[in-house]
Amino acid sequence: MQPFKVHSPYEPAGDQPQAIEKLAQSIQTQHRYQTLVGVTGSGKTYTMAKIIEKLQIPTLIMTHNKTLAAQLYSEFRGFFPKNHVEYFISHFDYYQPEAYIPRQDLFIEKDSSINEELERLRLSATTSLLAHEDVIVVASVSANYGLGSPAEYVQMIQKLEVGERLHQRELLLRLVEMGYKRNDNFFDRGDFRVNGEVIDIYPAYSEDEVVRVEFFGDEIERIALLDSVDRQALGELPSYILYAANQFIVGQNRLHEALKTIESELEERLAFYQKEGRMVEHARLKQRTEFDLEMIGATGICKGIENYSRHLTGKKVGETPYSLLDYFEFKGKPYLIIVDESHVSLPQFGGMYAGDRSRKEVLVEHGFRLPSALDNRPLTYEEFITKAPHYLFVSATPAPRELELSQAQIAEQIVRPTGLLDPLYEVRDSQNQVAALFDEIKAVVARGERVLITALTKKMAEELTKYYADLGIKVRYMHSEIDAIERNQIIRGLRTGEFDVLVGINLLREGLDLPEVSLVAILDADKEGFLRSETSLIQTMGRAARNLNGRVLLFAQKITPSMKRAMEVTDYRRSKQQEFNQKHGITPKSVTRKLDEELRLEGVGDLYAKASKKEKIPKAEREKIIKEMTKKMHEAAKLLDFEEAARLRDEIAKIRAL
């Protein structure tokens, strides 16, 4: 095991040393729950990293959205460059679950689009957990959704050794059993191809390496790694451990047993419908399930196979399904779950289960699914919160549930390493808020700084964006319908100065870490509700806490209880921060944060768009982009899409010139 070692030019400062010591000691003395109350800009992520370094145990870091998960993944890869830092979020670019609307007699088929790169990263995460000890996985709430059994996954491991006696046909059959597909023409991840006594395997979890196995008769003569794009040899290996192509793979024995139990459940359910005289549901369930059974028996898979997960994993009715947490538990060693922005993340867990259950109960009732489909579900809140040995809740505004669970194991991180104080705030009359804000925006932009504006409705945000754009302000609007990749690009555009003002509805949920922002404007701050609650106001005000000139304007007709409490919390924190600075002779300074490389989840066009915004790209980064685009160019040529191949060729030439 490679020890966890934080790589950073900084040492703990401000409130970080006492928070690190208290929380690490709490976990080491076997307390299950602890909370870090850390203000925006206090270096909570660095504190989390130092706690992991101190504990030396595998860690799952969970948060409530993909944007924040991507940001954390980038930061932790920087902190732990020599350890296995993995990324686990939903692999769907688009997902429409199957559903039935009885009053309209309308059945909606499941429809989805899987992002291959996200799928690779998910496989890489589970593979690392089984193969290594020094693993950190950054995940969204997808970590709570069902996966295949880790025990079955381990059974599917194939070790290859030079000199091993193994018939080529045996290996080919084993690869098929492991979920790999033969493809001698369009070779991609999860495929293998055969050329005489040479088998090339592209592991489903590999970023850019192909495994070549060369036989001499019934003996493995050579194992080598090849570059996936140019097929150049990267080196020879004495052995190689190959993992399955997906997390839902099961062995033949388990599969045959599952077919029997599915048939048994089907017979029982059909008898129920027969007794009730519900022949429409009887016919529907019989036709759908028998078709699925035939497909599973012939190919090992069917559309919607996850609905049979209870049978495929051997779980009992109502038993907790397998999830990513079981891969952490598999080796029987302690691990830590860090829940970032816990005041938002934890409530999602209960909501996920309730929504999933409600939809599937309708499907089961009307004969679209067997009752066992109800066990293909995310973890409940209670299951999640009692599964791991140690939890660390992290938030600037933890909810009562986190504080109650943690009891005395709570550390405050109010003093920032930079000495920055919580931003000054000012309450302004909201009667003429748009015009008044325009003057403030001009002054901030003239200093080369940025502005965040939060509105109450989508319509208002859109109109505000158009209004300021017509007045010559470089402004963009960010809303919930924008996907994670575009959201990251918008945030980067704000930081680089592509535009100066970002308008949103609930920007506090976007995981924004923007040192360039010196003004946060909260429109209609006196409209009590979720978007203007005490927690939301504190979180939003904190977006201005990374800049020395940080200010918050609260536009309102009156001061609400939520506003009053948020301002009191801000005053308390400023007082404590000022006292610490005076005592230690600290002069506040703005946060400096590099424009880190974004998580590479884009298509080729996005890669070029990202590259073209940089004046100078590091050589390693440039070569990585070129390699990915070259691969896409070759794929386009194979598909006879020469126009696309030519476009990619031209873009590669442009990137080489940057």
From Swiss-Prot:
Domain UVR: from-to ranges: 623-658
One Pfam entry name: UvrB_inter
Function comment: The UvrABC repair system catalyzes the recognition and processing of DNA lesions. A damage recognition complex composed of 2 UvrA and 2 UvrB subunits scans DNA for abnormalities. Upon binding of the UvrA(2)B(2) complex to a putative damaged site, the DNA wraps around one UvrB monomer. DNA wrap is dependent on ATP binding by UvrB and probably causes local melting of the DNA helix, facilitating insertion of UvrB beta-hairpin between the DNA strands. Then UvrB probes one DNA strand for the presence of a lesion.
Location of this chain's protein in the cell: Cytoplasm
Start and end residues of each Helicase C-terminal domain: 436-595
Domain Helicase ATP-binding: 25-416
Protein's gene: uvrB
BP-aspect Gene Ontology terms: nucleotide-excision repair; SOS response
Lineage: Bacteria, Pseudomonadati, Campylobacterota, Epsilonproteobacteria, Campylobacterales
Domain observations: The beta-hairpin motif is involved in DNA binding.
Protein name (Swiss-Prot/TrEMBL): UvrABC system protein B
Superkingdom of this protein's organism: Bacteria
Quaternary context: Forms a heterotetramer with UvrA during the search for lesions. Interacts with UvrC in an incision complex.
Chain span(s) of sequence motif Beta-hairpin: 91-114
GO cellular component, one term: cytoplasm
Residues given in the record as ATP binding sites: 38-45
Family indicated by similarity: Belongs to the UvrB family.
Sorted UniProt keywords: ATP-binding, Cytoplasm, DNA damage, DNA excision, DNA repair, Excision nuclease, Nucleotide-binding, SOS response
Main location: cytoplasm
Keyword ATP-binding: yes
GO MF terms held by the record: ATP binding; ATP hydrolysis activity; DNA binding; excinuclease ABC activity
